[in-house]
Amino acid sequence: YVSKKFNLGKNPIDFVFHGGSGSSLSEIREAIGYGVVKMNIDTDLQFAFTEGVRDYIVENIDFLKTQIGNPNGLSEPNKKFYDPRKWLRIAEESFNQRLIKAFEDLNNINTLN
C-alpha cells in the first residue's frame, strides 16, 4: 500500500518481527520478503540456554545426587559435574548454537564484510 501510494520501491518500510520465537523457516523467510529487518527471538534463546542445562542434568543425573559417590565408585568425587562453570558453559554453547541458527535463518552470515 505504502509503495503504491507514495510511488516508492519494494519494501520502503523496515519492519520488526515481534514474537518471532517459534516461527518456522518459511515464515521467517516470508517475513523478510515483506521487509522485516529485525526479528525478536528472546524466548528461543532463553529456551536454548535452559535446554543446555536440562540436557546436562539428564545426562549426568547420577553424578549430581551427592558430592561423593557415583556409578564409578562410592568414594568418587562429583565436583567436576556439579561445578556451575561446567553446566553453565554447556548452556552457553546451546545458546550460541541457537544464535547461529537464527543468523542462518535470517540470511545474516558475513553481512558486515
Task: Identify the meaning behind each predicted range.
Residues 30, 34, 52, 97, ...:
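Alpha-helical scaffold segments in soluble metabolic enzymes
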Residues 34-52:
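Glycine-rich phosphate-binding active-site loops on the catalytic face of alpha/beta enzymes
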Residues 58-113:
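Extended, intrinsically disordered, low-complexity segments
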Residues 24-28, 48-57:
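Active-site-adjacent beta->alpha loops and helix N-cap segments on the catalytic face
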Residues 20-34:
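Catalytic cores of alpha/beta
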Residues 1-12:
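Alpha-helix-loop-beta-strand connector modules within alpha/beta enzyme cores
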